[in-house]
A protein has these predicted regions:
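N-terminal pre-catalytic segment of deacetylase/amide-hydrolase enzymes
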Residues: 619-656, 662-667, 675, 805-809, ...
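Aromatic (Trp/Tyr) and acidic
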Residues: 38-114, 134-193, 197-198, 219-222, ...
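Bacterial Sec-dependent N-terminal signal peptides
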Residues: 1-30
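Acidic-and-aromatic substrate-binding clefts and catalytic sites of carbohydrate-active enzymes
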Residues: 359-363, 378-379, 398, 659-664, ...
């Protein structure tokens, strides 16, 4: 996750240009409302924050978003103290929503204006933890199920070990750390242990939908979170090939050669591109093959943390999975790794090569406490318990939470200095000790928590973390520490503070954005993330937790940061902290493997048990009621819940064009429409949007003001042709297909939140597909049947071929026969037909429009038709 120069752009001209453009395009909105976009639990302390550029005296009501019924009245906006958190908004107010406890979907509405919040839900979250697990699978090295590809099979060649340098060591597997493709035991050991902790604390929240390779729809009888944890365990075993040996890092910053898919790695470490990479042995001494050296003093941090993970695995695989052989293998590794840590107390840091950035962890007693406690649980050997107590007192309150940073504006520590960000060792030891020691352990947690709570008093959102690099990881750590403290003591004193930090991650923050990719599905969330799968494949990767806001002073001192577009959050940037959803800012919007793994427990805490795998959205489009496949507007005609015709009492109708493989009619269609000042709708696949040859016509259609929407990413057949009720894709496949389509639209500036309608591939779907689409916030539309206009793609030798003249005549015949004519019609043709059809209907679009206008029809875009 450590970068030097990923974005090579002009250093002077581009920032100035972006500033000018941003200044010209900033919204004139003077009041904004911030809520947790994913929603609130019934008994939560629920808070909305109102930002205003002028004094605000409005009174709010809460309305049911589906029925419009007022459920709570006379909610006052309580003014908060002035602070540097408002950007251009100088006034902050808080609205308490805590009296609303009935599950449902709501909006906060100002009684005297059209100001309203985004929709929010009250009730348990869907299975967002499964989205986070899917992100982890996308980060896998070796076999990657997201890419269905194998990478880095040559990892790697040893350095600093007892064997000769460049000896081959099998270090394949593990996870790529972030947007780069380095692998660290520092982070992987923590991620592995934290997933097992999440499993043990929230077993009912995890399902089985993939196999051990992460392949979809191949359940193997093991909860997916344990499949993912085992991916980490297997890698740790490889890095610990024999007693007394441990490797800690694969590759270094020579990896940073722009975005690349892992199977096509262009980095060359001296053995050719996409070949061997260095594997660093943990010798407990300063390392670095070039000018920059680490400050390592021992190996206890990584050895202890790995030992803790192995000891936990022993318990789980022995008791829950009944795999005694693997359990015993893990226990043996745990004891040997722990012994290594005792022999070399101290910390092994990450290695850099040509840049000054590395993982600077310099704590280790917490890891040894964690390992000793877990080993005592596994073996009941008293020496482990004695060690755990000793290390606990040595670790004490040591935490990033203890930093004095009242201004939130300075980088107070080296990157990842006090890692992991939560000392789980205190929690692991707590049930094993006497009452006095229990109080001592609880006090360690409480000390850090109270520091954060005190600092939060100066923040209108109730957040008190220092804004170090990866501040979102600190927010997750605070939530986790409060939760573990509550489990230990039963003390709920800090529960509201924990909720405020959760809400910060999910949209109640100055920027009004979730910090998780794709969550909630129809909310504001990171899209232009610093991730190769996003940037190269133009596909969304749900679930990744991005680094998050960073102190402006730190941001300004980092190398290689250049925004690639105007700052959409320019109005809201606080004085001392910045956040950007821009690929050029690796410091705030790069998702990380370990931060996401830590957050799995947080998501599981707030989700319902026994939920289906996919989370779906928590916020609906303003055009669609969440989860509803009923026919909400009796002006329209529906088939299987999809709209197939608009208002039949109006002479307005829509011209719709779909496209996947072919686009040869684009210019002719655009010219015909422009000449007659007609706006139409184009539903195009992700494949169409990604095809370089189509870029010019897509940009023109957008510039001309046409509606551009999704038509699936890969043009999948969703439902069986002969048995329409038989769905041919899983919900996960459907959601990924649609999300990938939207990701391909994003480079053209098409905001999914402004695209409420979806036209399915093959113009074929069923009610289940409509339900899934509706749950994501999108209404399915389809063509009005009866004219056969949709047959304009058929090849000359197709038995169902129909000529363009015949299609045009059938449209006219239908208009004459139907008492309502073409009122409300959705008339579908294609933007291209391919080389096998020589008679192209798109050459008749001008003639068609002239005839429609002569009959008094008003062709408009589909979003206008279905208002």
């Amino acid at each position: 996750m450590i970068y030097t120069d990923q974005v090579l752009l002009m250093k002077i001209i581009l920032p100035l240009l972006l500033f000018i453009i941003s200044s010209l395009t900033i919204s004139a909105q003077t009041v904004e409302i911030r809520v947790n976009q994913a929603g609130y639990q019934a008994n939560d302390k629920k808070k909305a924050v109102v930002l205003s550029q002028e004094p605000f005296s409005g009174e709010f009501v809460v309305k049911n978003a589906d029925t419009g019924k007022v459920v709570s009245e006379r909610l006052q906006a309580r003014q908060l103290a002035a602070s540097p958190w408002g950007g251009s908004f100088g006034y902050y107010y808080e609205v308490d929503l805590s009296t609303i406890k009935t599950p449902g979907t709501y909006r906060l509405v100002d009684k005297s204006s059209d100001l309203r919040s985004i929709k929010f839900v009250i009730g348990p979250y869907p299975a967002y933890q499964e989205d986070l697990l899917a992100f982890m699978r996308q980060q896998r090295c070796g076999y990657n199920p997201y890419l269905d590809a194998v990478c880095h099979t040559h990892d790697g060649r040893s350095f600093y070990g007892p064997m000769p340098d460049e000896t081959f060591i099998d270090a394949s597997g593990g996870w790529h750390d972030a947007g780069d493709q380095l692998k660290y035991l520092i982070t992987a050991s923590n991620a592995t242990a934290r997933m097992m902790l999440a499993y043990e604390l929230e077993k009912a929240k995890f399902g089985d939908f993939v196999d051990d390779l992460g392949r979809d729809d191949r359940p193997n009888g093991i909860p997916d979170i344990l499949d993912e944890a085992k991916w980490g365990l297997d890698w740790i075993h490889k890095l610990h090939p024999k007693s007394g040996q441990l490797f800690h890092q694969v590759a270094d910053d020579r990896d940073h050669r722009g975005f690349k898919l892992p199977q096509n790695d262009n980095a060359d470490y001296g053995w050719g591109a996409n070949s061997y990479r260095p594997v660093y042995f943990a010798d407990g001494k300063p390392q670095g093959l070039s000018q920059f050296k680490s400050r390592s003093t021992g190996v206890a941090n990584i050895a202890g943390r790995s030992a803790a993970a192995m000891a936990m695995a022993y318990r789980i695989w022995k008791t829950d999975l009944k795999d005694t052989a693997f359990a015993l293998k893990c226990l043996a590794a745990a004891e040997d790794l722990y012994a290594m840590g005792k022999r070399q107390e101290g910390f092994q840091q990450g290695n850099s090569f040509g840049a000054p950035y590395r993982y600077n962890e310099d704590t280790w007693a917490d890891d040894m406490e964690y390992a000793a406690a877990e080993l005592y649980k596994a073996t009941r050997k008293p020496e482990y318990l004695a060690d755990a107590k000793r290390y606990a007192r040595l670790a004490g309150t040591t935490s990033w939470m203890e930093f004095e940073d009242s201004s939130m504006g300075e980088q107070m520590s080296r990157h990842y200095e006090m890692y992991p960000f939560t000392n789980v060792g205190h929690f692991a030891l707590y049930p094993l000790v006497d009452a006095k020691t229990k109080r001592e352990l609880a006090s360690y947690y409480r000390s850090g928590i109270e520091r954060i709570v005190a600092r939060a008093k100066t923040n209108p959102y109730g957040v008190g973390v220092p804004f170090l690099w990866c501040s979102n990881n600190l927010v997750v750590a605070f939530i986790t520490q409060v939760h573990l403290y509550e489990l230990m003591t039963g003390d709920k004193k800090y529960h509201d503070a924990m909720i405020a930090h959760r809400d910060w991650l999910l949209g109640n923050n100055p920027w009004g954005t979730s910090m998780f990719e794709g969550i909630p599905a129809n909310g504001e969330y990171p899209e232009d993330t610093h991730l190769p799968t996003v940037q190269l494949l133009k596909k969304q990767v749900r679930g990744g937790l991005v680094d998050g806001p960073i102190a402006a002073s730190t941001y300004n001192g980092l190398i290689g940061l250049t925004l690639t577009k105007p700052d959409e959050f320019a109005l809201f940037q606080p004085r001392d902290v910045v956040y950007h959803d821009d690929v050029g800012d690796y410091s705030t919007n790069e998702p990380t493997m370990d931060g996401t793994a830590d957050a799995i427990l947080v998501m599981a805490m707030f989700s319902r048990a026994g939920i289906s795998r996919l989370s779906g959205p928590r916020v609906s489009s303003p055009h669609v009621s969440k989860g509803s496949s009923s026919n909400p507007d009796n002006r329209f005609t529906y088939v299987e819940g999809g709209i197939t015709r608009g208002d039949k009492t109006s002479k307005r109708m829509a011209l719709v064009f779909t496209g996947d493989e072919f686009a040869e009619g684009g210019t002719a269609i655009a010219d015909a429409l422009a000449k007659r000042n007609i706006k139409a709708s184009f539903f195009l696949t992700g494949r169409f949007y990604r095809t370089r040859a189509n870029r010019q016509i897509i940009e023109r259609l957008k510039k001309d003001g046409h509606y551009l929407g999704p038509h699936s990413d890969a043009h999948l057949l969703y439902a069986d042709w002969t048995d329409r009720n038989k769905t041919l894709v899983t919900r996960q496949q459907f959601e990924r297909d649609l999300n990938d389509n939207f990701a391909a639209m994003r480079p053209f500036g098409i905001d999914r939140k402004q695209v409420p309608f979806f036209l399915p591939p093959y113009e074929w779907y069923n009610r289940e597909i409509v339900d899934w689409s509706s749950a994501m916030g999108y209404q399915i539309v389809n063509f009005t049947p009866g004219t056969r206009s949709n047959a304009d793609y058929m090849a000359d030798d197709d038995k169902n071929y129909i000529s363009s003249d015949d299609i045009l005549q059938r449209i006219k015949d239908y208009e004459a026969k139907d008492p309502k004519g073409l009122n409300g019609f959705i008339l579908l043709t294609h933007i291209g037909a391919g080389p096998k059809r020589t008679d192209k209907f798109f050459n008749h679009i001008g003639e068609l429009v002239e005839w429609l206008k002569s009959k008094g029809y008003e062709p408009i875009s589909v979003d206008e038709l279905l208002k």
